[in-house]
């Protein structure tokens, strides 16, 4: 065991979704969230699916698109300080398998939520707005862009 030895990554945020078992853990976490919401007695199935979708997308937005920097002291001399986690992922390379997974997972959850809510207009609007709020920041054209200066510093 190498005690006191630093990791080999300059910025560990860049490779976290490529860790072994991370995708399975992510899917199990979403599944557990849904089971917990279904176990609440006064939530109907459509409400549980919509809440699962909204909570998932809210968490994804906060952790991937709102929080900037890195929790580690990195030797990159502050290059990651102004980047969101999404922009740091896979060293900023577009269309990697991790980015595709994180892009397709809210879409699959949206389809499931839409199906189980029987395309009710209220749920459909909420789920669509939630989906767009996490898909639009993932577009390659918005890499490093701060709309209206929000989250600039």
UniProtKB/Swiss-Prot annotation:
It is a multi-pass membrane protein. One of its GO terms (biological process) is regulation of ceramide biosynthetic process. Disulfide bonds: none annotated. It comes from the Eukaryota. It is found in: Endoplasmic reticulum membrane. The keyword Endoplasmic reticulum applies. Pfam families: ORMDL. The chain crosses the membrane at residues 27-46, 47-67, 101-121, 124-144. GO terms for cellular component: endoplasmic reticulum membrane; serine palmitoyltransferase complex. Residues 122-123 are extracellular. Ceramide-sensitive subunit of the serine palmitoyltransferase (SPT) complex, which is also composed of SPTLC1, SPTLC2/3 and SPTSSA/B. Plays an essential role in the homeostatic regulation of sphingolipid de novo biosynthesis by modulating the activity of the serine palmitoyltransferase (SPT) in response to ceramide levels. When complexed to SPT, the binding of ceramides to its N-terminus stabilizes a conformation that block SPT substrate entry, hence preventing SPT catalytic activity. Through this mechanism, maintains ceramide levels at sufficient concentrations for the production of complex sphingolipids, but which prevents the accumulation of ceramides to levels that trigger apoptosis. Ceramides bind to ORMDL3 N-terminus and stabilize it in a conformation that physically restricts the accessibility of the substrates to their binding sites in the serine palmitoyltransferase (SPT) complex, hence inhibiting SPT catalytic activity. In the absence of ceramides, the N-terminus is flexible and permits substrate binding, thus liberating SPT from inhibition. Belongs to the ORM family. This is ORM1-like protein 1. It comes from Xenopus laevis. The gene is ormdl1.
């Amino acid at each position: 065991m190498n005690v006191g030895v630093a990791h080999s990554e300059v910025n560990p945020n860049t490779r976290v979704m490529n860790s072994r078992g991370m995708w399975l853990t992510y899917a199990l976490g979403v599944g557990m969230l849904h089971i917990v919401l279904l176990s609440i007695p006064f939530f109907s199935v459509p409400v549980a699916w919509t809440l699962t979708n909204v909570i998932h997308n809210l968490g994804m937005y906060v952790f991937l698109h709102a929080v900037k920097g890195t929790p580690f002291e990195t030797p990159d001399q502050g290059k990651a300080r102004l980047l969101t986690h999404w922009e740091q992922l896979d060293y900023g390379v577009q269309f990697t398998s991790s980015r595709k997974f994180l892009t397709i997972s809210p879409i699959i959850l949206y389809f499931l939520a839409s199906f189980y809510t029987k395309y009710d207009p209220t749920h459909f609007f909420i789920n669509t707005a939630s989906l767009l709020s996490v898909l639009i920041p993932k577009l390659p054209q918005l890499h490093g862009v701060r709309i209206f200066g929000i989250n600039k510093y």
